[in-house]
Amino acid sequence: MKLLCCSKFLLLFLLLSTLLFASEPKKSAIVYYGSDISYPVVGIHDYIIVEPNNIDVYRHGFEVYTKKMYAYVSIGEIDPNDPAFEKLNKNLIVGKNRAWKSHLLDITDPAYKEFLFKEMIEPQIQRGFQNFFFDTLDSYQLIAKTKEQRTKSEAALVDIIHTFHTKYPHAKLILNRGFEILDKVHSDITAVLFESYYQGVGGKELRYKKVSKADRDWLDIYLNKAKAYNLDIICIDYLPLEKLPTDANKLVKKIETKGFIPYIATRELDSYGYSSKNALKREILTLIDESKYDRTYLESHQVGALPLEYQGYIQKLYNVAQKPLPSIAQMQQYGGVIIWLTNNYKEEDKLIEWIKKLQHYNIKVLFMGSFSITNPSLLTSLGIYTSDVKDTKETNYKVIQQSKLIGFEVEPPKTPLTSYIQIRDGKALYTIENEKQQSSTLAAIMPWGGFAIDQSATVEISQDNLWVANPFALFKEALRLQDIPVPDTTTQNGRRILFSHIDGDGIMNRVEWNPELFSGDTIYSDILTQYSIPISVSVIGAEINNNGLYPKLAPQLQKIVKKMYALENVEPATHTFTHPFFWNKIENGDLDPKYRLKPKGYKFSLDYEIKGMLDEINENFLAANKYPKAKTVFWSGDCAPPKNILRYVYKNKILNINGGDTYISNLHPWLSYVAPMGLERDGYYQIYTGEQNENIYTNEWLGPYWGFKKVVQTFKLTDKPRRLKPIDIYYHLYSGSKRASLNALKYVYNWAIKQDVNPIFTSEYIPKVMDYYTVSISKTDHSQYLIAGMRNLKTLRFDTLAFKDIELQKNIAGYKKNQTESYLHLGEKTKVILNAQQTKKQAYLISSNGTITQLSRGTKSIQLKLQAHTPLELELFVPKECKLSLQPKAKKIQKENNTVTIVYTKQKEATVNVQCRE
């Protein structure tokens, strides 16, 4: 791809002084033509210009940010590698741009216009792009030598742009320069882009160079015209990669003074540069080796992702067994690196050099478990010196240095050392010494990052994996992670999220105390109709369909399913047709019957297993007016879908959940028993459950059958000392077949509904997690935060000790302070601005069991519309000079000081108005 044409109300952290009101953040832009786009990096910008053929439109981030994305289209030129080239009438080729090895096309020929719209623009519209960036508008000048030819070409450009605006009236359009036609098309476009104002590229080799004042003066003539039309003007300047960290921000400020939106990047435009706003780098690259085990089963994922996620960061797993180390340009999206390899890295000298190069870009590196090399002398360049241990069985060591960071769940074990380790210019976290005063530092913070090796990070005891180091503190200190507002998936409007989902297994199991009943009957009568909270129920097609395993029982089972799905509080879902046991065994679209259920005559089809089942549920088991419809697959078997299957569900807009082993208990109160929120494969996320199902708590359904009661321990331990998970009551339909298991369900539900919760459907939880992985956060020089991409995820979490009252902004409904964590509630908009300014008290929402569907806030007022799945409850802070009104009126209103508690007995929707006097 070539270059562009070259011619607190609550806020954060230790704020010691009140700041003046911070205005709307400056507009920013990014131009990224690479592949594997990072939405946490680009999402914050107002203009996101991309090479559309490098964008996977099925990934969640595209759906979140598509309104701000602009698809690149070259006008009057075409690259031979462009997919549209095959469909080009070659008679349109009238020349060659040798600098770019592209073909010049006759834009005055009506056939070109037809080709442009049919083969280059419309396919991208169909893929989901809404906005476009027209490049190479001046290519015609290479072939139009006479004034008449130029006039004709410019008229053709104007016609193309007018046609685009007429054909796609809601689309936005950016032009690269186009100065010659600006007077005729300015009303059809949103912005003008140009390049090389102070720093550009030139010559055959496109070398970086300074731009002359004469060239800037020439540009200013045309740019002033664009300003007069009130168009945004995007200026791209170019710097070598190694100069970006030191020079880019200076250049940004310089360009801003001219009234332009700056973007500073390398000439390739395939890494992330700098603009007026820049995203905090939330992604942490984690090097892994999947040559033996899939990432699902690696310690790096199972225990390493959660501490990052809790602090607002994202683990990005990178398999070095299949790919070389990323280039330094590719590393610009990352906030740090964790090396967590189970084998030594083969090209260890390259690994060390790579780490050293990253330091110029302030990307820190943390070694976990080992240094992953065989030649320890390579470590000397990192300030680490090793010597051999003569007595490899010696364990008589004393501790001479131990940070508070060490000894988190267990003290470091006394095990034999493999080498003595000394450090230079670092802070030792854990150092031991033998009787000969030979010392070894096993964990340290270093100028380039840090390390925790030889069981100073984690240790296995009785098959439990325990943290020796505090992972929250270790990751933060070693990688120099900033404290940031954390997009939080556990809480909504100040209350812990509660959802419940049921895997469809065993609907046909006979009830042990009444063989006339099926387990589906008792789940319906004793659970679904008795607890009004949202519950998502899946079915296995082969268990209930006429062409399934039980054709004689099918009519009765289908009747049960229809009764379940007729309930207002029940959401339908699929647990597939044949319950695949091992998803990675699907080869060439087929799955051997030994890896699934075996209905007679069935030929395996992935499409039928998932989308086909959802369609059948919606068409055959739901009333026409039933909402929500079935749109979620609950993974079966090993719950480990490979990337091609994840891509399938995203392509078909199907939600997914299951997997992850969260079953921390009083007997096993270790962080390793709490799973992360999900697992990424090639940009697609498998969403994990909140907690595990009853199969785990009953020893794989061998007993005790009351064992699911212990999930309450899990709920408690994932709430304090840190709220790590929502409450997810997750089980199988076969739990309705035994008294002990059914009573356990009642015990769990009864406990859950007594908590301070916000009940939602499973299909409402899943998109919150999907949002987490694409939210983009920026911090300005004035301690102002801008958070974008909060589409379904509506909570930001802060450390309570770091909070200060600040002005409540447009999209902020309120907040709730708990002992250690405080939660900020957002309105229906996807963007929020947090300004550090203390102000007098305003009315705000403290908590609610509902969802905010509309928020309107003035300087002296707030209006909220809320909708809940159960009778609405809310708590408000209402200053005494303010008046509260409700529609409809509530029967129970309790006031204590400035706190008003409102409880409805039936209504699930209400409008709240608070108006305050001057």
Mark where each language-model region is.
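Catalytic grooves of carbohydrate-active enzymes
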Residues: 227-240, 483-512, 528, 607, ...
